[in-house]
């Protein structure tokens, strides 16, 4: 269950839905067990310099080593920059969960989540 957050100066014209779909596609291509990416965008109207920072949070797993992370980072940077149509300061951070991180799905009867099957 990866998480994606983008924080950016709001003078950047970004189609966040396509942006998130493309990032999720890269992550799942590199790691088919990653699953749905919970994604959030934070455009900022008060800023100094045009910029974007993308933060990717993943669970710690044995196969997500330095080599995996470097390849993922390079591919994510390439795909993210396809969405940037103007010059900007760019930052990308990939981080891994700590030992006491909890993640799951909280379900309420008769309630649904987007893109989650109700069977489980």
What would you call each of these model-derived segments?
Residues 6-38:
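N-terminal first-folded block
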Residues 50-91:
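Mid-chain, well-packed structural core segment of small domains
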Residues 47-49, 64, 100-102:
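Short active-site-adjacent helix-start/loop capping segments
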Residues 10, 43-45, 96-98:
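Active-site-proximal loop/turn and secondary-structure-junction residues that shape catalytic pockets
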Residues 36-39, 84-99:
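A short amphipathic beta-strand at an alpha->beta junction
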Residues 91-113:
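Short, highly charged C-terminal tails/helix-capping segments
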Residues 114-120:
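Short acidic DE-rich linear segments
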Residues 1-7, 31-59:
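Short edge beta-strands and adjacent turn/loop segments
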């Amino acid at each position: 269950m990866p998480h994606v957050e983008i924080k950016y100066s709001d003078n950047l014209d970004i189609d966040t839905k396509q942006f998130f779909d493309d990032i999720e596609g890269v992550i799942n291509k590199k790691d088919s067990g990653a699953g749905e990416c919970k994604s959030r965008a934070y455009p900022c109207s008060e800023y100094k310099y045009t910029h974007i920072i993308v933060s990717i949070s993943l669970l710690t797993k044995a196969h997500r080593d330095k080599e995996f992370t470097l390849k993922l980072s390079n591919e994510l940077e390439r795909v993210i920059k396809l969405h940037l149509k103007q010059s900007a300061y760019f930052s990308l951070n990939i981080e891994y969960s700590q030992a006491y991180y909890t993640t799951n799905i909280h379900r309420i009867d008769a309630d649904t989540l987007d893109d989650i099957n109700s069977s489980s």
